[in-house]
Structures are given as C-alpha cells and as structure tokens.
Design a protein with these regions (language model features):
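Peripheral, non-catalytic segments flanking oxidoreductase cores
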Residues: 1-328
C-alpha cells in the first residue's frame, strides 16, 4: 500500500501549526495525502454532499449513449462534456477503460456561460455548486498552509487561483468499468501527473496507484495501491505547484488500473475536483531553488499557455483523448 499520511481537516481549519507542517512534509515526499473530513462540522457537510454526488455520478455516466453523444467533448477545442470509453490510449496502445464528464468551474460559478448539460443534471446544480465552493475553501486553506510553511506570504498561491477568475478548473465525474474477465486486468488510465495545482479525489473502490519515489513507471513493482478511506478525500499536488516552487512540492506520477480483489467486479465511481491556476497567472517560479532541470523555459508563460503546451505534449504522445473521427 502507498504511504499516505492522514491530515485532520478540522485541525487544519484551526491552523494547527504541526498539522500544517505535516501537510508540507506530505507534499514534499509523496505528493499525496488523505484529508480526514470526519469530526468537523464543515467536513460532515462535505461527506453528505459527496454521498449525493456519487449517486449523481452513477446516474450521469449511465445515461443512454444518444444523450451522451449530444454532450460529448469536442477535442481539441474543448475537453468539457462526456469523454467516451476508449477515447484515450494506455501505454500498450490499448483503449482506456473509463468514461468521464467534465464540468467547468467557470460555467458553474457564472464566470462564463454554463456549458450544455444533460437535462437530468440541471436539477443537481445546487449540490454541485455547493460542493464546488467547499472544494474552493479546502484549496484556499491548503494554499495558505503551504505558503506559510514555505516562508512565503500567505496569499501567494491563493492570489494565483481566484475562483472568480477564468481558469481550467473542472469538476469531474468518472466511471471505471468493472473487470470480470482476465483481459480486463490491465491499465485503465495511463500513468500521468495532474496539470493543475491541487486535486481533491473522492472514491470508495480501489484502483488508483501511486509511483514510488525514484521508481520507473515501467516497473510494475514500483506501483503501490492508494487505498480509499471512509470520510476522507485523497489530495495530490499538481504540476503547477511543482513549477511555482522549483520542485519543492511534488507532483507524483499515478495511474488507474483494475480494482483489487472482489472490488474488480463492480463499476467504480469517482468525483474529482481539479484546481488549476487563473488563465493569466504567471508560471514564474516563486522560490529560488537549485533545481534548474527542464522548466526554465516555462517561466515566461501564462498558466493557460503552459497548460496548452502540456496538453499538446500528451496528445503527441497519444495518451490524451483524441478527436472524434469524422463520420463517413
């Protein structure tokens, strides 16, 4: 099992210095940790919303195909909407085994017009927007804690990712298919790091794996299971935090494969909040470090330019979802 420390959300909200130090250590070492929502008033409300979102996720990703097709993503123009099964490839050039539906934070918050949604989702907007706001609060709390522990002004990271400004931040609903057959026991979502700042992941069934520090993604023994825990979010750092801190905070490689044990016989539903910087935020490093490896050329880019560059790199490698084939 992956070594993921558990951080108390209640103590973090109270700005406990030792808890904040624990967050920094986790983000430097593994880049992943569990955020325990239990025993806290706000955390309890979050748990209730997550339970509702799991039902919404299942309902949405089991809509008829003709409904999904009306709201399918339009790659490369837009990644919003449904990503169908098999649209991306794994490391063995096999089709992926997951579907997802991406909703823009900008649309949900009113920064931009709301994207077209399946009719069933409009009635769920209040709980989705409430959850979105709670996630924004968590991100802000983590950003302040990390800035403080890095001896930066507490507003350093929050100033670069205001929820009221345009960004690539999304609320994502995912379905990973059950694996009843031997040929299903493979990679579902290829190894990758997240583009953004911080990801908040809610799931019940296993399948997420984290690469050990120093391990090769081609070495199966270097992959460790990230076990979900009741009442906890899985939190991980994204590439933007690594870029801003000159490599001090770690954006760790991870992947999704078939669930372990008997869990592989059921479909897995996941709710993810993927925070990204404001589109116009600078990707210039905020800390002077000795790491001058390969990212100096990115310092003059805006966050949007930087994300497009990374997305195109993934697309050239064949790992990103591909554009629809034109119909004959």
């Amino acid at each position: 099992m992956a070594s993921m420390p558990t951080i108390s959300f209640g103590n973090l909200r109270r700005r406990d210095d030792q808890v904040e130090k624990g967050v920094l250590e986790a983000c430097r070492e593994a880049g992943f940790f569990l955020l325990d929502l239990r025993g806290d008033e706000v955390g309890t409300r979050l748990i209730h919303e997550i339970d509702q979102l799991f039902h919404i996720c299942e309902e949405t990703l089991n809509l008829p195909d003709n409904v999904k097709e009306q709201h399918q993503n339009d790659i490369p123009r837009s990644f919003l909407g449904f990503k169908p099964l098999g649209q991306a490839k794994t490391e063995n050039d096999e089709p992926d085994r997951y579907e997802m539906f991406n909703m823009s934070q900008d649309g949900l918050m009113g920064t931009e017009p709301l994207q077209s949604l399946p009719p069933s989702l409009y009635g769920h907007l209040p709980v989705m927007i409430s959850y979105l706001r709670h996630c924004q609060d968590i991100i802000a709390i983590l950003n302040v804690a990390l800035a403080k522990q890095l001896d930066l002004p507490e507003s350093t990271f929050t100033a670069l990712q205001s929820p009221t400004k345009k960004s690539g931040t999304v609320l994502r609903l995912l379905k990973s298919y059950a694996s009843p057959h031997a040929e299903d026991l493979r990679t579902f979502l290829i190894h990758h790091t997240d583009f953004g700042t911080i990801t908040l992941l809610a799931n019940i069934v296993g399948g997420l794996q984290i690469l050990k520090p120093g391990g090769s993604p081609l070495d199966e023994s270097a992959w460790t299971w990230a076990r979900p825990q009741p009442g906890c979010l899985i939190v991980n750092m994204g590439d933007a935090m690594t870029q801003w801190t000159g490599g001090i905070l770690r954006s760790n490689m991870h992947r999704v494969i078939h669930a372990p044990g008997a869990q592989r016989f059921v479909d897995k539903y996941t709710v993810a909040y993927l925070a990204r910087p404001e589109r116009d935020a600078s990707m210039k490093r905020l800390l002077n470090t000795h790491d001058v490896s390969d990212n100096e050329e990115d310092e003059g880019l805006t966050a949007w330019e930087w994300e497009v560059k990374r997305a195109m790199s993934m697309a050239r490698a064949g790992y990103a979802p591909q554009a629809k084939e034109p119909k004959a």
